[in-house]
Structure formats: C-alpha cells, structure tokens
Regions:
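Acidic catalytic/metal-coordinating carboxylates
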Residues: 32-35, 58-64
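Active-site beta3 strand of CheY-like receiver
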Residues: 43-49, 54
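Conserved acidic carboxylate
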Residues: 7
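Charged docking surfaces used in two-component/phosphorelay signaling
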Residues: 14-22
Length: 122
C-alpha cells in the first residue's frame, strides 16, 4: 500500500515516513501542495496524509483539486492539522476528507491505525 505524505515539516515527515515504512507502507513524501497534487495523479497512492498549512496552497485548496480530478477523487485523505485550525478541519471533512489528526499530539501508531481503518484493514 502506498501513502502520499504532503507536509512541509521535515522532522515530522521523517518520523512518519519511518513509522509507515516499518509497517510495510510505501511512502512518497513531498513538501508543497502542488507537488502533492502532481504526485497524487502520477503515483496513484492508496491514501493521502495532507497538512492543512503548506507554503504554496492550503490543505483545503488541495483537497478541492483532488476531489475534482477523476484520477484522485476517490483516494481517501486524512488531514494533518494543529488545534488552532479546527474550523479548517471541519471544512475539510465536509469536502470529503475521511479523518483528521492533530499532528503534534499524536503517536505514529495512532496515525497508522487511522490509515488502516480508512483503507479497510482493521
């Protein structure tokens, strides 16, 4: 199973890439929204972990684009967010995100469980 991780926090990306790889996932990590949109289309991930705040686009703008594209509209998206962005998370869920994670207060194992649940593996 392939996970696309779209996040500009290098330390967090390293931690989650290692944890997901250890669990048998293939991880494609990018740090801008446009790279994420491009990789979602070309890499055909099984799931996307999407940060809400990126240097070039908001997570919700990326989610909108993903849901409009035939190639990516059915890929489950889990939002990575901070507590200060709860309204954005609610908006993302309304736009089709399957779940959310408050990224700085969660263990990788909890994210892996959410991924497995979203992929129907639990």
């Amino acid at each position: 199973m392939k996970v696309l991780l779209i996040d500009d926090d290098e330390a967090l990306t390293t931690i989650f890439t290692a944890a997901l790889t250890k669990e048998g996932f293939q991880v494609v990590a990018v740090n801008t929204g446009q790279e994420g949109i491009d990789k979602a289309s070309t890499e055909a991930p099984n799931l996307i972990l999407l940060d809400q705040v990126l240097p070039d686009l908001s997570g919700n703008d990326i989610l909108k684009q993903l849901k409009l594209d035939e190639k990516t509209k059915n890929i489950p998206v889990i939002i990575f967010s901070n507590f200060s962005q709860e309204e954005l998370v609610k908006e993302a869920i309304n736009q089709g995100a399957v779940d959310y994670v408050f990224k700085y207060q969660v263990e990788p194992k909890d994210v892996i469980e959410k991924i497995k649940r979203a992929l129907g593996q639990t």
